[in-house]
């Protein structure tokens, strides 16, 4: 299975500043020029919401302050400017190989 290592495990960011979350895969999640890396946001009591798919594409209705980048094994999610509503858990997920696997999560809070 592909192992995803997220960092940091927790992060506190001031309103209006930038939050950066990293995800490293144990092997490349690229195939045919596509990076099969996705990012999800989860709030307590709610199902995960897709933010970013294929490394850098925004999900439907996702605000422009969320962006993703990376390829191969190294990826990042950026949130800028940070808003109060962005307090949540964030997870990377690879969909290159079954079983699809998730990172351990990052808890994002307001500083």
From Swiss-Prot:
Region (Complementarity-determining-1): 24-38
Chain residue ranges for the region called Complementarity-determining-2: 54-60
GO biological process, one term: immune response
Record field: transmembrane: none
Stretches for region Complementarity-determining-3: 93-101
CDD domains reported for this sequence: IgV_L_kappa (cd04980)
Name by which UniProt lists this protein: Ig kappa chain V-III region MOPC 70
S-S bridge residues: 23-92
Native organism taxonomy: Eukaryota, Metazoa, Chordata, Craniata, Vertebrata
Region spans: Framework-3: 61-92
Keyword annotations: Adaptive immunity, Bence-Jones protein, Disulfide bond, Immunity, Immunoglobulin
Annotated Pfam families: V-set
Region annotation Framework-4: where it falls in the sequence: 102-111
Extra facts: This is a Bence-Jones protein.
GO cellular-component term (any): immunoglobulin complex
